[in-house]
Structure formats: structure tokens, C-alpha cells
Amino acid sequence: MKKFYAIFTSLTLFSTVAKAQQTICGWITDEQRSPIEYANVIALSVRDSSLVTGAVTDNAGKFLLTLPANSAQVFLRVSGIGYEQRNVSLPLAGDTLLLKSEAKAMEGVTVTAQRPKMAIRNDALVTTIVGSSLAKAGSGNDVLKHIPLLTGKEGSYSVVGRGAAVIYINNRKITDATEIERLNSSDIKDVEVVTNPGARYDATVSAVIRIHTVRKVGDGFGFDVRTSAYYWENWDTYNQLNMYYRRNGLELTAGSAYELDNTYDNQTTTNEVQAANLWTNKWIKKAKYRNTHNNYTFSAAYEFSANHSVGARFFTNLLVGANNAYPNFSTDVLKNNALYDHIESRTNGTTTAIPNKSLSAYYVGKVGKLNIDFNTDYYYGEETELRTTTEQSANYDNRTVTSAGTHANKFFATKLVLSHPLFGGSLSVGNENTFTNHEQSYTNQEGIVTNAASTIKERNNAFFFEYSRLTPIGQLMAGLRYEHVNSDYYDQGVYSTEHSRTYNQWFPSLTFATKIKKVGLQLSYSAKTSRPSYRQLGTNVEYMNRFTRQSGNPTLKPATLHNISLVSNWDIFTFVANYTQTHNKIMHWNEQEGVNENITTLRYRNFKNLPVLTLSLTAAPRIGVWSPQLILFCQKQWFDIERLGSKFDLSKPIWGILWNNTFDFKDNWIAETRLKVTSKGIAENTELTRTTCAFNFSVRKAFLNDRLSVTVGVNDLFNRTANHVILYTNNFKTSVNQEYDSRQAYVTLRYKFNTARSKYKGTGAGQSERKRF
């Protein structure tokens, strides 16, 4: 197999022998003197190769081993994903150790990229990007689309069986989804997918994606620019510019992105309500939306030394002008299957916003053996939606409904994590505090819907610890998180004892990872929570049409999730099994108005228990220029509800296939295809009634040593991604058949000059709270 010549790693060691123990400290770097993070360094007995102790390098490439006083003669074994394992005797003959990459170059032959390598590392499934075909994919989003277990797009991704994922770049939590698009695939070292995050993560975080980039050196000015145009039914565009200045330990960055998104949404909806009479609403919706966004990012980072760095970042997101929606509805209303009324309605909606603002700062340092990581964040945003609906009824009075809804959010958060070696492992302890203020109001001039205004003031104080240690049989990680949440609810400015809540919860986590011959195994357990969003908790009753309302439920309880996952990796195959038991699961439900049985209000409620099993199998070989990746997955739940006086089973599984293909041709030509098929089935209390299929195709050509690239492609060629679904409740059923302009032909141009990875190391504080806004 054609392989790259070794990426060399140099290891500098020094040891001090004390009366009680011996300490070995060193750094691992590549041939450019850039540190290699997460390399494993273990000390083994010369007599029987039994484990004495071990360590993992930090982000500076540093490791520290402490040998017991009575330990026999030992040798070191150094390994890392993408590198050949080496055994090293002590003392070293020299201060440099060369580790060969698993992708070796052969003299006199043309080298082609290798398939992305997958392996289990500690709590994560790791896909190596550098040196693989994915390094030429384009942007960070183009890479994540090919990572096993991930679904989603444009900076918003979920892990199969675990839900929405929080994304980190170089240990910094991202708050701007466009950062993924701004990231060049050639700068990504590897991607980690964590299916059971530990105690250091917020208790609401059920999955994590960690992206590590290749460390680059060099001072000066750099920039990258990208422009994309999309067309089929409408014209859309996305443009961005990022600038960098680096000198010594200082880095200044500034970036801007502009997006114009024009869409249409055609729906056929049938609502059936079985009250004293059977009420049926059948409507056809035709809507057009125009959305524009512009965001700006400014950051500064300074490294005083390898052990101390600080930074700050400011981000603002603007709605340029106003975002507009123009849906039209044609509705037939039936009572006991006989025509009751016909209504033609038109809605004009406009959304305006005060620019969202967020400011974050961090300090990352090391004092002796103590690692310090401190972050603080502030956020403010406010949005107002104005809506006017005009209804013309064939048999009853015409109606005009004017409404205004406002949401305002602000929060402040801090997070401190301290780490120190302990008993041959590493102990981390920390504290995270979040202070949130959420205000929402809804007014209706005609008085058809009651005006409402509510405020929620919430404080979350969390303490946690994590301990990890390499044992003779594998890596063990254990953690415990405690959260005290105090939520004060105000209705029309008056404190509500009934709706205010206090929670005290413990969230344990445990992960064990090992390797048996060539098979990697990871078994983990975690307890998490899913708190209702502020919109779900609100008392606002929003007018949808004269027969349908939508509202929150301030009595909702947080859901508790218990998850067990198994990950296994061998050669080109990866198998993942997730079992999640959710208590107090939050789902849609409905209520009938007391006076008019034909008026339905959609709300939310808690369900006692929802067990879900998810299985996935990935195969990712490489055959010449072709790198296929086939993923098979299945999701099965065991769930039923009381519907129309009897049990209604909602346990039909969902099956799926994801087939990615990359063709890496000569002269920097890359072609990609992506096919995703999802079967009919049921998730929660919603049934998917149509098999969906999405087929994407693209061709990329790079010029000027990959500084300039052009990509041409088509998304959803057959326009088959729109869902057809049915929502079931006790006496209510709604069937929605949706069509929208997911099919797009596009062209993207990128140019980058002297770009390098950001020095910004902040990880963010209270970020999961922002998702509830």
C-alpha cells in the first residue's frame, strides 16, 4: 500500500529520582516541533510486560509519569492514532525518538491519500482526517458529513441515538455555527464523537463532537474568503471573510458572514379531533420565506508561554432589515364528515431583532502539576415577531387577527476546571455557574387570544469531578456532577409559587475502554437531563387559526435520561449500540377549549417512560481512488399512549442507510456522492409515513497548491427529503405532508492565504443554557 514517509515524533525526557518515587516528564512533538496531543505513554515491566503506570499527552504534547519506589526495571511504549507503536528502553540513548506514521511514503512513487482511520480513544470514537481523503473535502461541514454516527448539516449535527451534539474546536465550545464552515478541512487533525459525555459537561449535553486542528507555525497576516450561490426554485447566497494577524504569542482575528435564504414550504395538513363530535380541518398551505443574516466575530488571544494564555471573543448576529413570511391557507372544516365551513386566509409575518451579542473570555494555565481552565460568558438577545392573519369564511364571520410576540434573553456564566495527577491517573474538579433571565410576551389586539407575559429567572450552580486512570486491563474514567437549579417564574410580573421550581440532582458517569488484540471496545454509562426550553415553559397562547392554538406548559418537569452505550472498532468496521431510558419525556399533546370543543390547543406534557435502542454498523474501506463508507442504522422504541379509550402502540422501528463515496483523482480533482435513505417508522408520538431519500453530488477542483478551490454540486437531486408525518395524542391526530425546495444546484469558490489554526483556547461556560433560548 502506498503510504506517506513517517511523520517524525521527537521525545525529550528527563527524570528525577526521589527517595520515594521516580518521575519521568517529557514532550512529544512532530518534526515541525508541533506538539502531538493525546499520545499514549505507558511504562511496562521488562520482566513480564505488565503495566506499571501510564499517561496521555496534553495539548502541549507534555506527559508526566510517576514510578513507584519499588517498581522493577521498566521500558516505555509510545503510541498514537496514525502512528506506529514503538517500545523504548530506559535510559534513552539520545533525546530524540522517531515514530513512523502508519501512512509511509514510498520513494519514487506517487502518494495518494489514505482512507480516514477510525479508532476508540478514551471516551470517544476518533476519525483521523489529516493525510486522508477527507483532508481535501473543503470545509469543516464537508468533513462532518462523512463522520460515522453524525447526521445534520451547516454546523448543526446530531449523534445517532443520542440527539443534538455540542461541538468543540480545540477544546473551545463553538457558539457560531458558521465557524464549522469557516474551518478548512486541510487544517483538521481528527474528529472525536463522544456518545456518553462525562461529568465535566453540562448535564443537558447528551453528545459531544470534538474537532482538533493541525498546529501551524508562522507569523504575519492571513485571510480566507468563500462565496457560494445556490439555485433551483430560488436564489440563495452565502459569503464569508475571515482575517488573521499573528505575531509571536499574539493572534487577532476578525470575521464576517452574510446569508440570504429564500424558501418555499407547501403543506397539506389534516387535523382530526374526536370530541363529542368529529371535527376535521383540511388545509393547504403555500408559503414563501425570506431570511437574511449577517454576523461578525472579533477575538484576541495571547500566549505568554507554553503554560499561560488568555483570550477574549465578541460575536454579534444581525437580522438584516426584517425576515418575512407569507403563508396562504385554504381550509375545509368538516363536522362529522359534513362540510361545516370553508376559510381562505393569508398571513403576513415579520421578524425583527435587536442584534444578539455575546462576549466570552478565558484563561488557560499551568502551575507546577496543576492545570487551570477558566471561562466566562455573557449573552443578550431580543426578537419580536409581528403577524397579521386575515380569514375569509364562507359560512361565518370574517376575521382579522393581529399579534405580537417578543422573546428577550440574557445570561452570565462562569466555569472553572482544575486538573492534577493523582495515584497514577488524573483528577479534575470544577464548578460552573449560570444566571439566566428570560422574558416573553404575546399580545392580540382583537382579544381573541388572551394576552400573556412571563419571566423566568434561573440559577444553576454545578460541581463536578472526573478521574481517569490507565489500568492493566484498560482505561477507566469515572465522574460525578451535582447541579442545584433554582427557577423563579413570574406571571404578569407576579411571582408564581405554583410554577417555580427547585431541583437538586446527581449525574454519575462511567466509561471503560480497552483493546483486545485488534478490536477496540468501549462501554459507558451516564445520567443526563433534558430541560424544557423557555418557549415550552411559557404561558403564551399563539393563534394559528380559528380552530387551532399553540401554547407552552409551565408545569413541565425536566426529563432524566439513563444511557448505556457500547462501541466496538475493528479494521474498517465500527459498531455502536445505545440504549436510553428517558423518564418524564417531553412531547406534544393537546387540550380542548372548555366552551368550544372544536378549538384545539397544542401543548406539551411529560410522559413517564420512553426506552429507545439504537444500533449502527459502519464499513469504511479504501479501494484505489475510491473511498466508500456505508452506514446501516436502526432505531427502535417501546412506547404506547392512551388514545380514544384504548392503548395505541407506537413501537414501529426506523431503519436507514447512509452511503458516502469519495473519488480522489489525479490533479486535485475530487468527486463525492452521498445517499441517505430513512424508512417509515415511529419516533416518540410521531409516525413517519413516507420513506425519504436524499442524493447529493459534487465535484471539487483545487488550484494554486490548494489555496484556491471551486466546488460544483447538487443537493437532494430527486427532491425527496421532505417528511410526511402523523402526530398522535389522546383524541387528536394531525397528518402533515410537506414539500419544500431542498433541491439546489450550487457553486462555491474558496481562497485562503497563510491561514492557521486559532490560538483561542476558551471552552465556554453555560453554553447549554443558550440552546434553551
Predicted ranges, named:
Residues 295-320, 343-492, 515-520, 574-576, ...:
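Face-selective signature of the C-terminal outer-membrane beta-barrel domain
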